[in-house]
């Protein structure tokens, strides 16, 4: 896969390996609220980025078309758009096709063709689930069709991202005009890769999205692990592997967020050795079978899909992450101030323990009475 290099912005002179800001807000009752709330949270963390990337993931924003897959697309040219649409038309019924609404912003440069499609698969192979069919579509477009990139591909959700500061990206995409029940956001300070539109966060596959602060030093191993399951990493940044790993473990394998967290941020061997026998057997098996999925390096991530939001630190907690609750709201952010600016008096505020997830689940989707899980560190 190749991309038009002039749109890439070198960032080698701006390397600060501990920056980036993340924020997530969820209403566990499914009540939708304006995107302006998450924008206010991100604006407070402006200094955590350098203008080379920002973005938002929103859930519940297309209620009238909630049963259709929505592809948010980025194109380099009209020819790239034509080539991608020919492929999409061969495999999907296009119910609606339109530009992603934007407004002019003086700080947003090198704007690409931004389009969205509401789709229904035409034919699903017998040996493939509908979700796997959509994943294969995304992999093909990102890898094989030059100048075309799928920003998001889930139902009743979308990713909006680009090169700029969070407030400018929000203004450009008119985020204040959308309402959703889960919002996540990212302010980028690129460390090892270039700042470009496709490399901004969130990263997504189906309705899964990930925003990430840190550095995945195990990217090469994680990438090879994922390739064995049909995932292709083409977007030139380490965070891409996290999106595919959560799709693999939580959707395809059916693992819980808690178990998935213990694969991605596995306990140290010295801690496993001290566990009770049954627990020790479980974590030993996870390490032995899924060692290629272990995320090495400092990280703080927020993962979301249509039913849940999860915050997770690396197993030593080398990046900040704070959580809070207020009534039916769950907040997760890099800084407590980014929570208090939109929720001045939360019911509870805590710093999650290293490697222990904070999980919020929609009340309508939960299987038990547990709506929120996570330990205070």
Swiss-Prot record:
Active site positions: 20 (for gatase activity)
InterPro entries recorded: GATase_2_dom, Glu_synth_lsu_1, Ntn_hydrolases_N
Entry keywords, A to Z: Glutamine amidotransferase
Pfam families: GATase_2
Domain Glutamine amidotransferase type-2: 20-377
Gene3D superfamilies on file: Glutamine Phosphoribosylpyrophosphate, subunit 1, domain 1 (3.60.20.10)
Name of the protein this chain belongs to: Uncharacterized protein TM_0398
Organism of provenance: Thermotoga maritima (strain ATCC 43589 / DSM 3109 / JCM 10099 / NBRC 100826 / MSB8)
